[in-house]
C-alpha cells in the first residue's frame, strides 16, 4: 500500500526482493496499491488497474438501476466539489504573484516578520512583533472577505447556511510560523474569534500557550467539544494530510503551495475531506475544496485525469 512511497526507497526494494520469489515452483504475484501513483506509473507498461473517484461516484449513481433492492455500498461516499477564487485579482499587490508561473504566491502573502532586515527586505515597524504578518492588513481583509455577511456573496463563511456546511474544516498554510500568526489573528477576528470557532493549530508544535500533544487527538477533542453548534478550523502545513481520517471534516482550504505543487500531494490533501461520515444519523453527502489559485487547480485536475 502507498506504493508511490514504499516502492521507491532502498528499504522498499529490499522488502520486495525478499518477498517476491520466482522459479522452483514459485510465482509470487506483486500488487502495488496507490491512490496517487504519478511517480511510479512509468514502471508499469501494462497490468495497470484504475479505480478512481469519478468511477466510484458513477457506480454510486447507477447502483439502484443496476442492483435494485440491494444496499448501495457507495452510498456514504460524499461527492467532492471544488470551488476556486482568484485572490490575485482581489489583492492587487504584485508581490503576491510568482513571476515564473503567474500563480498566487501564498508564501509571500502569509510572510511573517523575522526581525532580520536582510530577510524582511525592510525595517520592521515599531508596532509589529517578530512572528506577525508582514501583510497583516491584507490577511485581515481576506478574513473579512470570506466572512462578510452578504446574501449575494458566495464566499465560504458569508452566511450561516454556508458555515453549517463547513462546520469542521482543514486550512492548509505555507508553514509553521505562518500557521501560528494566522491562529493569533483569527482569534482576534469578530467572526472567527467570537467564541463559536475553535482554531486548532497542529502545524509544528502548535501555539506556544498550548501543550504539544498528538495532532489528531487535538482535532478530535476540539470537534467533540464543539457539539452541534460550534465550529472548528484546523491549521496545518502538512500534518494530518496522509494516512489519517477525520470523518467530520467537510472542507479543505488550499492556502499553500504553488503552480508547481505535485499532484500527488495535492490529491492526498483534498481527499482527506472525502472520507465517509455518518454521525448522529446525519450522513455527509458533499465535501468541498476551496482553492484560491485557479490555475493551480486546473493543473491538478488535468494531471489526475491522466490516470484514468
Task: Name each model feature, range by range.
Residues 35, 174, 238:
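Conserved H-loop
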Residues 25, 29, 41-169:
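Interdomain helical connector at the RecA1-RecA2 junction of SF1/SF2 helicase-like NTPases
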Residues 11-17, 43-51, 185-189, 250-253, ...:
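Short secondary-structure boundary/capping segments
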Residues 8-12, 46, 125-150, 178-179, ...:
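Phosphate/oxyanion-binding active-site loops and adjacent basic polyanion-contact surfaces
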Residues 19-27, 74-75, 162-164, 224-229, ...:
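Conserved catalytic network of the ASCE P-loop NTPase/AAA+ motor domain
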Residues 4, 199-307:
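Conserved RecA-like P-loop NTPase helicase motor core
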Residues 1-31, 36:
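SF2 helicase catalytic motif II
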Residues 175-203:
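Conserved helicase motor "Helicase C" RecA-like lobe of SF1/SF2 P-loop NTPases
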Amino acid at each position: 500500500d502507498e506504493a508511490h512511497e514504499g516502492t521507491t526507497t532502498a528499504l522498499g526494494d529490499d522488502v520486495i526482493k525478499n518477498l517476491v520469489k520466482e522459479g522452483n515452483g514459485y510465482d509470487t504475484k506483486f500488487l502495488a496499491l496507490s491512490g496517487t501513483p504519478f511517480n511510479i506509473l512509468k514502471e508499469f507498461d501494462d497490468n495497470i488497474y484504475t479505480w478512481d473517484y469519478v468511477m466510484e461516484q458513477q457506480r454510486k449513481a447507477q447502483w439502484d438501476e443496476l442492483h435494485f433492492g440491494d444496499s448501495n455500498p457507495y452510498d456514504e461516499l460524499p461527492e467532492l466539489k471544488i470551488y476556486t477564487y482568484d485572490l490575485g485579482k482581489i489583492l492587487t499587490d504584485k508581490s503576491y504573484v510568482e513571476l515564473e508561473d503567474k500563480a498566487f504566491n501564498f508564501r509571500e502573502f502569509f510572510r511573517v516578520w523575522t526581525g532580520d532586515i536582510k530577510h524582511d527586505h525592510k525595517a520592521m515597524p515599531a508596532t509589529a512583533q517578530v512572528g506577525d504578518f508582514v501583510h497583516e492588513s491584507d490577511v485581515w481583509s481576506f478574513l473579512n472577505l470570506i466572512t462578510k455577511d452578504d446574501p449575494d456573496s458566495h464566499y465560504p463563511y458569508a452566511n450561516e447556511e454556508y458555515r453549517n456546511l463547513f462546520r469542521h474544516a482543514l486550512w492548509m498554510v505555507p508553514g509553521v510560523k505562518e500557521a501560528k500568526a494566522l491562529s493569533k489573528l483569527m482569534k482576534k477576528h469578530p467572526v472567527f474569534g467570537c467564541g463559536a470557532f475553535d482554531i486548532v493549530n497542529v502545524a509544528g508544535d502548535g501555539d506556544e500557550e498550548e501543550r504539544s500533544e498528538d495532532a489528531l487527538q487535538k482535532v478530535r477533542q476540539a470537534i467533540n467539544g464543539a457539539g452541534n453548534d460550534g465550529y472548528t478550523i484546523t491549521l496545518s502545513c502538512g500534518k494530518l494530510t496522509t494516512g489519517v481520517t477525520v470523518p467530520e471534516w467537510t472542507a479543505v482550504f488550499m492556502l499553500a503551495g504553488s503552480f508547481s505543487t505535485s499532484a500527488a500531494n495535492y490529491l492526498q490533501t483534498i481527499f482527506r475531506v472525502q472520507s465517509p461520515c455518518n454521525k448522529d444519523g446525519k450522513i455527509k453527502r458533499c465535501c468541498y475544496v476551496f482553492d484560491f489559485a485557479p490555475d493551480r487547480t486546473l493543473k491538478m485536475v488535468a494531471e489526475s485525469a491522466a490516470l484514468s
